[in-house]
Amino acid sequence: MSHKKQDAFQGLIDALKVLPNVGPKSAQRIAYHLLQHKRKEAEKLVDALQTALKQVDHCARCNTFCEGGLCDICADETRDGRRLMVVHMPADVSNMEAANCHDGLYFVLMGQINTALGMDVSAIALDRLAQRLGGGEVEEIIIATAFTAEGNATAYVLSEFFKNLPYKVSRLSQGIPLGGELEYVDAGTLAQAVYERRLIKEGGA
């Protein structure tokens, strides 16, 4: 039994479906639009993606995306290394920086726990977080996950992970709307959530 060779257009649709919140219909519309109206822009997109794949990697300390060994924040010696904020994704770091409410450092999990999608503890880079804490300067860990089912599950796992470790642990206050992702929260609300963060455990073993 022979199989029809996949054509280039269908291959483009299938490739676009890997993007967040892009299903078959959306992928088809994007493919039509790029090929019919935005061919030059599509070529620039391909070039930019190829360049990023070659040059962008993870920061050796905080796990965010950067070019070179350390991101600008980790390389900044004026930051307060005693406070480490743990966030879901790089966009959360950008939002915190825009809110100007945290002068410490970050660790980016690059994922969150979602059992429905088969994303367990292996999705949140706990091994890299443990390595990051090996430096000994951290005193307080601020859990800055969203107040969604996935964010709460991730926060619970992190709380258990830190339970017997000698760190003060806190979490953002619930000024952030229930079900809200940090990337959609305004700077004022985000700053208030940091300043009024809820203590989970005191420091010390």
Swiss-Prot record:
This is Recombination protein RecR. The keyword Signal does not apply. CDD domains: TOPRIM_recR. InterPro entries: DNA_Rcmb_RecR, Rcmb_RecR, Rcmb_RecR_Znf, TOPRIM_dom, TOPRIM_RecR. Belongs to the RecR family. The keyword Metal-binding applies. PROSITE patterns: RECR (PS01300), TOPRIM (PS50880). Pfam families: RecR_C, RecR_HhH, RecR_ZnF, Toprim_4. Residues 82-177 form the Toprim domain. It comes from Neisseria meningitidis serogroup A / serotype 4A (strain DSM 15465 / Z2491). May play a role in DNA repair. It seems to be involved in an RecBC-independent recombinational process of DNA repair. It may act with RecF and RecO. A zinc finger (C4-type) spans 59-74. One of its GO terms (molecular function) is zinc ion binding. Keywords: DNA damage, DNA recombination, DNA repair, Metal-binding, Zinc, Zinc-finger. GO terms for biological process: DNA recombination; DNA repair. Coiled coil: none annotated.
